[in-house]
Amino acid sequence: MTTSHENHNTAPAPSPQNIYDDPRFFEGYRTLREQDTGLNGALEIPAMRGLLPDLRGRAVLDLGCGFGDFARHARAQGADRVTALDVSANMIEAARALTHDPAITYLHASIEDCVTAQAAFDLVVSSLALHYIADYPAVVRRVFDSLKPGGTFIFSVEHPLQTAHPVGWVRDAEGNKLHWPPDH
C-alpha cells in the first residue's frame, strides 16, 4: 500500500485491471466523467446515494475511489472520516488535487490488497470497481471483517451488457451479414 507521502513518478505499465494509468485512456476517461452525461450520473450515482444510511459521524471506506467524488460527498453528508483507495496512481493524484479535506485519506492500493483494522468502518462503498477484481469472495470477506457490527456494504458493478465482448454479425467470406450468433 502506498501512502500520500511516497513518490509515484515511476509507475509500472498498467495491468488490465489498471488501465486508468495508461495516459491516453485516463485522459479520455477524465473527459467523459467531466461531461457527466453518461449512465453514471443519470442512474448509478443517484441509485447508490439512495441506498446510503445517515453518514453523520460515520467512518467510511471507498474501494476504487476514482476521482474521489464519493469521498467528498460522504464528508459533505457528515461522515467523520473517509478512507478512499484506488489501484490507479493517476486517479489518486487527481482525487488529491480535487480534495482539500484532511478528514479524507487517499491510498494508492488495489482492492485485493487492502487490509484494514477489524471493525473499523460503518460503511464500505464500491462504485463500479468490483468487476475488476479476480477474487470476489476474498474481497467480500475482507469487507465484512472491516465493518463495525451493523455496518453496511453498498456496491455497484457494470451491467454485463457493458462488460461482455461484442460478437457482432456472423459474416460470409465477402463480409455480407449472415446472422446474429444465437449464443451471444
PLM features per residue range, with description:
Residues T2-L55, D69, H73, M91-A94, T152-H184:
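Conserved class I S-adenosyl-L-methionine
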Residues L52-L55, Q118, V140:
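A short, aliphatic-rich alpha-helical micro-motif
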Residues L123-P137:
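A short SAM/SAH-binding and catalytic strip from SAM-dependent methyltransferases
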Residues P137-T152:
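A short glycine-rich, Lys/Arg-flanked "PGG" loop and its adjoining helix->strand segment in the class I
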Residues L61-L63, F67-C114:
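Class I SAM-dependent methyltransferase SAM/SAH-binding core
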Residues P53, T99-H100, A134, K148:
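Short conserved AdoMet
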Residues V115-V124:
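A short acidic, Gly/Pro-enriched loop at the edge of an enzyme's catalytic core
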